[in-house]
From Swiss-Prot:
Belongs to the PlsX family. SUPFAM superfamilies: Isocitrate/Isopropylmalate dehydrogenase-like. Catalyzes the reversible formation of acyl-phosphate (acyl-PO(4)) from acyl-[acyl-carrier-protein] (acyl-ACP). This enzyme utilizes acyl-ACP as fatty acyl donor, but not acyl-CoA. The gene is plsX. This is Phosphate acyltransferase. GO terms for biological process: fatty acid biosynthetic process; phospholipid biosynthetic process. Pathway: Lipid metabolism; phospholipid metabolism. The keyword Disulfide bond does not apply. It is an enzyme of class 2 (transferase). Homodimer. Probably interacts with PlsY. GO terms for molecular function: phosphate:acyl-[acyl carrier protein] acyltransferase activity.
Length: 337
């Protein structure tokens, strides 16, 4: 049975929605869930839901929490915080993975320094599978590493390649580096220095990717530093919500529009589902020894349940084993600088 530690005190709607998500995960997935946080707040929620005797739900008391505004490094000092305690459960082998909607920087710190990085991984990174008309495009890194060297981007490319193959089922994924033009030689110094290193790898490197390629499906993996990636991710999320809202406003303008909307409703609902972060659950910190799933600060019960599902999906693959192998074999010795 898979065991997942959930930080119940992290997120805008903690602990209520987090605990509800844990209940859903236990019911629908059958995993053992450790609800880590203040038992005085968690137990009443379980009792109200009549789930306090559920053997799949175990409360682990952690009276403190890491606030959203706190420096990420504080989590390593706050040893009674829900996030730290959850990380230690994974480190000790008492839990198989971690889910948190809390302070993203603090979750990254726990992933890197408590759960730890896998062999050969210099910097764990965050990869997100963005929808395109043909399937998914992996954008990596989207926030774990804002300042990078060329060697880090090369590792991100291999990590993204492995994610695309092992998790998304894309064979021989096409890899690109995000730049301001498709021609070799375009981009800032980081991109220009990384380009020849990526060419020297055994990856299916296709050159520079432009912003328009992210959602076009012309690349399967697009590499960038975490600063650029995070801006893209948040802008994309905002755009998706704005498009949905604009469509709603236009529908209200006339009877014909409302009638047309009824016919389009199935398609609109599918689009909305693709744009809904709750459906995706969370994004993994790739390269950590065990799954560390970062979910949205506004995560509701559905998002938490799906984040637990994502952790389980990783545990049911050989992702880390294949990642270590790929880092050893796809990057020539001369590129490992």
């Amino acid at each position: 049975m898979l065991r997942i530690a959930v930080d119940c005190m992290g997120g805008d709607y903690a602990p209520l929605e987090i605990v509800r998500g844990c209940i859903l995960a236990a019911k629908e997935l059958g995993y053992k869930i450790y609800l880590v946080g203040d038992k005085e707040q968690i137990i009443p929620i379980l009792e109200k839901a009549k789930e306090h005797n559920n053997s799949l739900l175990e409360v682990v008391h952690a009276p403190d929490k890491v606030e959203m505004h706190e420096p990420p490094s504080n989590v390593l000092k706050k040893k009674n915080s829900s996030l730290y305690v959850a990380g230690m459960l994974v480190r000790k082998g008492e839990a198989d993975g971690l889910v948190s909607a809390g302070n993203t920087g603090a979750v990254l710190a726990v992933g890197k320094f408590i759960v730890g990085a896998e062999e050969e991984v210099e910097r764990p990174s965050i990869g997100v599978a963005l929808p395109n008309p043909k399937g998914k495009t992996v954008l990596i890194d989207v926030g774990a590493n804002v300042d990078c060297k060329p060697k880090h981007l090369v590792q991100f490319a291999v990590i993204g390649h492995t994610y695309a193959e092992e998790i998304l089922g894309i064979k021989n994924p096409r890899v690109g580096i995000l730049s301001i033009g498709e021609e070799e030689g375009k981009g800032n110094e980081l991109v220009k220095e990384t380009y020849p290193l990526l060419k020297a790898t055994k990856l299916n490197f296709k050159g520079n990717a432009e912003g328009r390629d992210i959602y076009a499906g012309t690349f399967d993996v697009i590499v960038c530093d975490g600063f650029v990636g995070n801006v893209i991710l948040k802008a994309s999320e905002s755009l998706g919500l704005a498009v949905v809202q604009m469509i709603k406003e236009e529908i209200k303008r006339s009877i014909l529009a409302k009638l047309g909307a009824l016919l389009l409703m199935p398609a609109l609902n599918r689009f909305k589902k693709k744009a809904d972060f709750a459906e995706y659950g969370g994004i993994p910190l790739l390269g950590a020894k065990k799954p560390v799933i970062i979910t949205h600060g506004r995560a509701n019960a559905k998002a938490i349940k799906n984040a637990v599902r994502v952790a389980g999906e990783f545990l049911n693959t050989d992702f880390n084993k294949k990642l270590v192998y790929n880092l050893k074999t796809l990057i020539p010795e001369g590129v490992k600088v």
